[in-house]
């Protein structure tokens, strides 16, 4: 949850050995977060590339390893970087996601312009490198993985 105007650098963040049950969307990286006072402004929400300046957040490297998410509802993952400052690298290894039989509808991220959904797979946008290794998504409706504006996508 690092939107424009929140000048921060996130790098070498590792999440591992985690078990989740009955969560809406277990993996969310959202550069269009709307819960701050300026969250619904055009500056924060536009999907057009803006000039990079001191207010532009930077997310460099994130790793998710050995994680099981059971009985999920909305989406397996929703990863959305800025067009002007893509997320550097997201690596997901040994991930297993299943869905609740009666999955609730909901928003995959706190971001303007999204509709409610359920049983969605992984959605990734504006990332330099996305690595999915031994990632199992079971029970989704539609594609397990949808990528847009990814420079280097590796699936093993």
What are these regions (language model features)?
Residues 1-156:
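Extracellular/periplasmic carbohydrate-active domains that bind, remodel
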């Amino acid at each position: 949850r690092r939107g424009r105007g929140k000048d921060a650098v996130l790098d070498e963040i590792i999440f591992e050995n985690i078990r989740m049950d009955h969560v809406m969307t277990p993996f969310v990286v959202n550069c269009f977060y709307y819960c701050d006072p300026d969250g619904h402004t055009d500056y924060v929400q536009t999907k057009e590339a803006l000039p990079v300046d001191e207010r532009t957040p930077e997310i460099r490297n994130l790793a998710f390893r050995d994680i099981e998410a059971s009985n999920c509802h909305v989406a397996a993952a929703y990863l959305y970087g800025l067009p002007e400052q893509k997320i550097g690298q997201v690596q997901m290894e040994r991930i297993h996601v299943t869905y609740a039989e009666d999955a609730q509808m909901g928003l995959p991220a706190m971001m303007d312009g999204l509709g409610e959904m359920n049983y969605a797979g992984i959605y990734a946008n504006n990332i330099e490198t996305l690595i999915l290794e031994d990632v199992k998504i079971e029970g989704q409706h539609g594609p397990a993985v949808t990528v847009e504006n990814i420079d280097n996508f590796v699936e093993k």
